[in-house]
């Protein structure tokens, strides 16, 4: 899909255990060079243009800020007209998710390596952002995945698969905190979003009391 970088559940931050972080970074670089940015009507295109000038300006400002801070990055090398809305995918190594201010709807990936002993603190930092739509974990240690699932404040949790593609009626979709508005779309509780509760309270004593109860008492 040509909007893969701007789906609400698209990957924005990847956390990689430090033991394999450098190897993963090198693989990521190779994979990124295969990405094709261009006309979304062409089957060979992976990523199309950013939606408007305001959006691409915000993304470019974020990229410029991280580059100015001297962050290590990898980027594809296609050239585009400066007036176009096309943008090369780019990945930055950063130290903490705290360095990201708000959502970045575009082809920007933030790469963070971590120590296993820091996992609990990592989850706390993620929760502290206030956003909680999707999270994915790749691990063969199911107890560790369960630990993350229990602590992470996210609406959709994926294990050993991609993090997009929720299907209405099969997998309810929705987030928590700043990423949620209540019941999940596609789930049984979603219907409650379309109804309004209404209560009726009657002071029966004002009209002489409840006739049925009074009659039963007389019996």
Language-model segments: residues:
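Short helix-loop capping/hinge motifs at secondary-structure junctions, enriched
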Residues: 20-25, 97-101
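Short, small-residue-biased leader/transition segments that mark boundaries at the very start
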Residues: 1-3
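Basic phosphate/pyrophosphate-binding loop/patch that engages nucleotide-derived ligands
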Residues: 64-70
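Residue-level signal for inorganic ion chemistry
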Residues: 17, 28, 66, 107, ...
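Flexible, acidic loop-helix segments that line cofactor/substrate-binding pockets
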Residues: 5-13, 29-61, 78-86, 102-108, ...
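Short beta-strand and adjoining strand-loop segment in the mid-core
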Residues: 13-20, 91, 179-180
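Cytochrome P450 fold signature focused on the C-terminal beta-domain
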Residues: 72-78
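Conserved C-terminal structural/oligomerization subdomain of aldehyde/semialdehyde dehydrogenase
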Residues: 33-36, 79, 86-219
């Amino acid at each position: 899909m040509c909007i893969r970088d701007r789906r609400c559940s698209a990957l924005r931050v990847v956390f990689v255990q430090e033991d394999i972080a450098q190897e993963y970074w090198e693989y990521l670089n190779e994979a990124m060079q295969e990405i094709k940015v261009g006309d979304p009507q062409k089957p060979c295109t992976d990523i199309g243009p950013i939606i408007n000038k305001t959006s691409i300006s915000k993304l470019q400002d974020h990229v410029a800020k991280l580059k100015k801070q001297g962050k290590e990055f990898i980027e594809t090398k296609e050239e585009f007209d400066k007036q176009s809305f096309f943008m090369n995918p780019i990945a930055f190594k950063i130290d903490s998710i705290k360095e990201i201010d708000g959502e970045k709807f575009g082809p920007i990936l933030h790469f963070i390596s971590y120590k296993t002993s820091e996992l609990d603190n990592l989850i706390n930092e993620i929760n502290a952002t206030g956003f909680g739509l999707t999270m994915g974990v790749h691990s063969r240690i199911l107890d560790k995945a369960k630990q993350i699932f229990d602590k992470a404040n996210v609406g959709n949790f994926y294990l050993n698969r991609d993090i997009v593609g929720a299907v209405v009626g099969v997998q309810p979709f929705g987030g928590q905190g700043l990423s949620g508005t209540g019941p999940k779309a596609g789930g049984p509780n979603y219907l409650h979003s379309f109804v309004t509760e209404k209560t009726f309270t009657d002071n029966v004593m004002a009209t002489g009391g409840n006739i049925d109860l009074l009659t039963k008492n007389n019996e």
